């Protein structure tokens, strides 16, 4: 875990800290963070889609995930991977981006040492990175991924998947084939002790255009049940 001096530009007196800078493995990482002051509040990291295809932490699906975790009582961080926005470095084919995400988790844990749980979330490329991080960090309690690119990247590393989670997919996704995601969800679901909630959003394309509210509803509903906060 990183020491507290790895975090820069932090104002601890405020609950809302929209801009943070983290010392990453390739230089500074730009992020946005909202802190929940409740003792033991869970923490979450949200990861964006492919850096070479316009993916940033301000992507609408990423922002929807971020706000859904915040609304569910999480202290939540989203970052720009290396070479995106004001984050330093350059695209590293997933390897460096995985290290960026690991550093962001270290930052979250350093700033929230009493957190009751930690979750990972991601959209598209960010889902692939997030699931790899899930395998490397046994402390993760759960995951939420949207449009995991199972037709583009190898997900066989999830053998076994260490945590239950939520997978959301549009049935009109022109980038990620729904059938490939359904197959991935089914494969993970067969593993002992896991519960994978696979939800299809009818009519949704890859970017869930005009359907972010539906994504948010699925996420907040799932988190309420998973964290025991449902009424």
Predicted regions and their residues:
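Short beta-strand/loop motif that positions the catalytic acidic residue
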Residues: 161, 166-169, 173
């Amino acid at each position: 875990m990183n020491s507290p001096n790895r975090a820069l530009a932090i104002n601890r007196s405020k609950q809302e800290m929209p801009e943070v800078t983290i010392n990453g493995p390739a230089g500074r990482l730009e992020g946005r963070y909202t802190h929940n002051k409740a003792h033991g509040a869970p923490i979450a990291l949200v990861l964006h889609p492919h850096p070479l295809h316009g993916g940033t932490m301000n992507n609408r699906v990423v922002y929807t995930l971020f706000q859904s975790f915040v609304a569910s009582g999480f202290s939540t961080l989203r970052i720009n991977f290396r070479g995106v926005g004001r984050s330093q470095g350059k695209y590293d084919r997933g390897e460096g981006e995985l290290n960026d995400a690991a550093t962001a988790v270290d930052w979250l844990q350093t700033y929230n040492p009493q957190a009751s749980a930690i979750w990972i979330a991601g959209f598209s490329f960010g889902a692939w990175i997030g699931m790899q991080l899930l395998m490397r960090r046994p402390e993760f309690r759960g995951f939420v991924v949207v449009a995991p690119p199972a037709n583009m990247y190898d997900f066989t590393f999830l053998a076994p998947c260490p945590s239950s989670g939520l997978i959301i997919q549009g049935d009109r996704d022109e980038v990620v084939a729904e059938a490939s995601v359904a197959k991935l969800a089914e494969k993970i679901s067969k593993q002992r002790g896991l519960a994978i909630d696979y939800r299809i959003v009818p009519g949704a394309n890859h970017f869930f255009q005009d359907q972010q509210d539906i994504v948010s509803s699925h996420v907040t509903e799932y988190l309420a049940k998973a964290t025991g906060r449902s009424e």
